[in-house]
């Protein structure tokens, strides 16, 4: 697994128009890119000697609450979209419907216990549901 924050790409071998899937935002674009490069017989090298210290969310000036909402929404939206893209909508639905139900249950349990993490599960459920019904990745800071 190669994470996007540590990729070096030879742009001579990649068509810039096809670089990233325009539908994906924030998560899974790096994995999708590697999968497409591999499918097109491009070489992907991994050097296990390299180490990258990735400090998440440091490139944004969003407050933690807004970023947490966006992060959780897009994490679930992108997982479903990616799985659907490579396996079809039926298999994606079969795999992710239980996750949707569990996420909703966790949300309600956390609401009852007045746990502040309930917002995380609310946005996970909303992101997953949006992807399942075919909505584009739309949640951005200005929408909150």
Model-derived features: where do they sit?
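Membrane-interface aromatic/basic loop that binds lipid-linked glycans or pyrophosphate carriers
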Residues: 117-144
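A short, conserved alpha-helix in the catalytic core of glycosyltransferases
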Residues: 1-51
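Short glycine/serine/threonine-biased micro-segments
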Residues: 2, 54, 125
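Alpha-helix boundary recognition
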Residues: 15, 38-39, 84, 129, ...
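Active-site-adjacent helix/loop segment of glycosyltransferases
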Residues: 35, 39-120
